[in-house]
């Protein structure tokens, strides 16, 4: 997941990593100044995300990134590299920032409105996605006949 790209950044404030995995012990040793919270789900995850000023997403390979929408739903702007997953979700200045310089993206994301992040994520709620799906059924049916 390219965590060192985030962990090595010179940024103001505290760095927190939510989650676990086989590399967790080694990361704790290599980055003792970082707060590793371990895995979180549900309300605990949403609450932890909402405490952040920016959600830094260092992955270069994720194809969608549901976690980006989870952060936005908690009102947290995203900073990420301009690669496949984030490019389809992050809109510059609206819900986060993309840059090949992840530090620059993170610092710019501090200026993004938390409310605009929440509003954007609302377009991906179950109700909204169901509505979009149903609205596309009628045109697809007409094309099939």
What positions do the PLM features span?
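Nucleotide-activated donor-binding/catalytic signature segment of Leloir-type glycosyltransferases, i.e.
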Residues: 24-44
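Short hydrophobic beta-strand element within catalytic cores of glycosyltransferases
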Residues: 77-80
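Short acidic/histidine- and often glycine-rich active-site loop of Leloir-type glycosyltransferases
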Residues: 27, 69, 82-100
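Aromatic "clamp/platform" in nucleotide-sugar-dependent glycosyltransferases that forms part
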Residues: 60
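Short alpha-helical donor nucleotide-sugar binding micro-motif in glycosyltransferases
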Residues: 39-40, 47-52, 133
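A conserved mid-protein helix/loop that constitutes part of the nucleotide-sugar donor-binding site
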Residues: 1-11, 22-26
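A charged, aromatic-enriched C-terminal amphipathic alpha-helix characteristic of glycosyltransferases
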Residues: 110-145
